[in-house]
Amino acid sequence: MATIFFAEPELVIGHGRKVLFLNPGDLQIFKEIELPPDLTTCGLKTVEPVPAPGHPASSSKQQPAALKEATGSVKVEVSIQNVTYSPDRQLLALTTAGQKAVLLYKSRPENAQLLSIRPLARASSALRFCSDGSSVLVTDKTGDCYQYDCVEVDASPRLLLGHLSIVYDVLWSEDQQYIITCDRDDKIRVTNYPATFDIHSYCLGHKEFVSGLAMLTEQHIISASGDKTLRVWNYTCGKELLLHELPAPAVRMLVRQLEPEKTYEVAVLFYDYVDAIGVYRLEQTTTESWSITSTQLVRAEAGTWNICNFALTDDRIYVTGAENERLTLRVYDSRNGERASGLPEGWLKMVLDNLDVAAFMPEDLSVWFKKRFDNVSEYLERKKRRIEEQKQQKCG
């Protein structure tokens, strides 16, 4: 998986065992984090499996694959899954696959300093710091959401809530009263915090997976979905305020606040469409009224390579994807959608050489869509044939 995002003034790219920090103007690397091949060498603690009561201790041959991975008897390749900054940019959290862990770094002033490394139960799907950076939320692919303390950095995680399907994004309100999650089963859930056993509200209306969430105001969020819609909600009461039709399913969403206040730029990565990215201008007209005032579609040479992620700045769109099963990056002008000019010669080779990229296959996003089975039509067809056969027998 390749992750990329822009956090003023840095462009951050994570892939394999490295995180690169670039100046978005000249694309020069000024800092990097490299993980070791074995995370136990930097402090990841393993847990020995506990045999069932009355059962003899299992041999290594009898241990399930997951337990072999935890005890280190099977070597797995470490790869970065998600990366995010705290709001004040003082902390950076990242999660890994292979040896599943969440790592917390002090990111300032110069070189990143590892503060803690704690095991994850399952592969992560999203990361989000709280507003004061005192803890970070990690959601996983089975629907659970854990809280990791960033003050007591060695504290065990706390399970806060769970969904019945994979959680694709998570938000934490500025006042830390609500945790907002979205999942593959088209639901947006608003959960009270710290009493996370109490669900405050739902934002219902999407017909497919909800791939992204973003906070707009203290009471409003925007969501993107595989049902080809953008929607704005008052999440405190679960009320839909805007539904905007998209030309294709949305699999990634980024939101930037513009001037004047309550004006936003919303960028959406489409699934399998002739134009790869849609850029929309969103404005709040009254307290409970929103509108899309402009639309720009960016082709980004869709169809010639497999696009998987992107980052947005004031004037550029940075896109990652696969070409001939190799990771690559392309930069486009956000004003006209054309390839960006004025980039330093050799920048792409420099970045890819630093990432030491091997074969790269983006995630198969087709599995995000629900599988629908129509047993009724088949039943009715069989019933129709049976009735016709019975009529023929009577006539014969």
Swiss-Prot record:
Cross-referenced InterPro entries, in alphabetical order? Answer: Trm82, WD40/YVTN_repeat-like_dom_sf, WD40_repeat_dom_sf, WD40_rpt
Q: Which biological process annotations from GO are given for this protein?
A: oogenesis; spermatogenesis; tRNA (guanine-N7)-methylation
Q: In which pathway does it act?
A: tRNA modification; N(7)-methylguanine-tRNA biosynthesis
Family membership, please give it. Answer: Belongs to the WD repeat TRM82 family.
SMART domains this protein is in?
Answer: WD40
Localisation: Nucleus; Cytoplasm
Does this entry carry the keyword tRNA processing? yes
User: What Pfam family does this protein match (any one)?
Assistant: WD40
**What's the chief localization of this chain?**
nucleus
* Cystine connections: none
This protein is called tRNA (guanine-N(7)-)-methyltransferase non-catalytic subunit wuho
Role, per record: Required for the Mettl1-dependent formation of N(7)-methylguanine at position 46 (m7G46) in tRNA. In the Mettl1-wuho methyltransferase complex, it is required to stabilize and induce conformational changes of the catalytic subunit. Required for binding of nanos mRNA and repression of translation by the mei-P26-bgcn-bam-sxl complex. May cooperate with mei-P26 and nanos to derepress the BMP signaling pathway. May cooperate with mei-P26 to suppress expression of a subset of microRNAs. May cooperate with mei-P26 to regulate bam expression levels in germline cells during gametogenesis.
Ranges in coiled-coil conformation: none
Alphabetical GO CC annotations of the entry are: cytosol; female germ cell nucleus; male germ cell nucleus; nucleus; tRNA methyltransferase complex
**Which proteins does it associate with, and in what oligomeric form?**
Forms a heterodimer with the catalytic subunit Mettl1. Interacts with mei-P26 and weakly interacts with bgcn; required for the function or formation of the mei-P26-bgcn-bam-sxl complex. Interacts with nanos; may be involved in mei-P26-dependent derepression of the BMP signaling pathway. Interacts with Myc; the interaction may be mediated by mei-P26 and may be involved in the regulation of ribosome biogenesis.
Remaining remarks: Wuho means 'no progeny' in Chinese.
UniProt keyword terms in alphabetical order:
Cytoplasm, Developmental protein, Differentiation, Nucleus, Oogenesis, Repeat, Spermatogenesis, tRNA processing, WD repeat
